[in-house]
Amino acid sequence: MTGRGKGGKGLGKGGAKRHRKVLGDNIQGITKPAIRRLARRGGVKRISGLIYEETRGVLKVFLENVIRDAVTYTEHTKRKTVTAMDVVYALKIQGRTLYGFGG
């Protein structure tokens, strides 16, 4: 291993991607039926039409916060892969302890 650091296999240079997929507004991937199913699980019978966009917005903010904290843990330990434990710790510091994923 000559100067590749920890973990790297040294295959390729990782140059410019020729066909990079353009990431659009992925929050729309959280579909109306998916939101309805989550609401049903929470015991909701009827749902206002305005709820769907509001739910997408709240979910986006929540995930941004969790992912930011998880990536902070990953960078601190000098890794490039976010593990399940990083997410568990990120949720724990937000006061939402998650069981069943190790630790």
Curated annotation (Swiss-Prot):
Sites bearing N6-acetyl-N6-methyllysine, chain numbering: 6, 13
Key word Nucleus present: yes
Name by which UniProt lists this protein: Histone H4
Annotated signal peptide: none
InterPro entries noted in UniProt: Histone-fold, Histone_H4, Histone_H4_CS, TAF_TATA-bd_Histone-like_dom
Alphabetical UniProt keywords: Acetylation, Chromosome, DNA-binding, Methylation, Nucleosome core, Nucleus
Superkingdom, taxonomy of origin: Eukaryota
A cellular component term, taken from the record's GO annotations: nucleus
Organism: Apis mellifera
Role of this protein: Core component of nucleosome. Nucleosomes wrap and compact DNA into chromatin, limiting DNA accessibility to the cellular machineries which require DNA as a template. Histones thereby play a central role in transcription regulation, DNA repair, DNA replication and chromosomal stability. DNA accessibility is regulated via a complex set of post-translational modifications of histones, also called histone code, and nucleosome remodeling.
GO molecular function: DNA binding; protein heterodimerization activity; structural constituent of chromatin
Region (Disordered): 1-20
Biased composition (Gly residues): 1-14
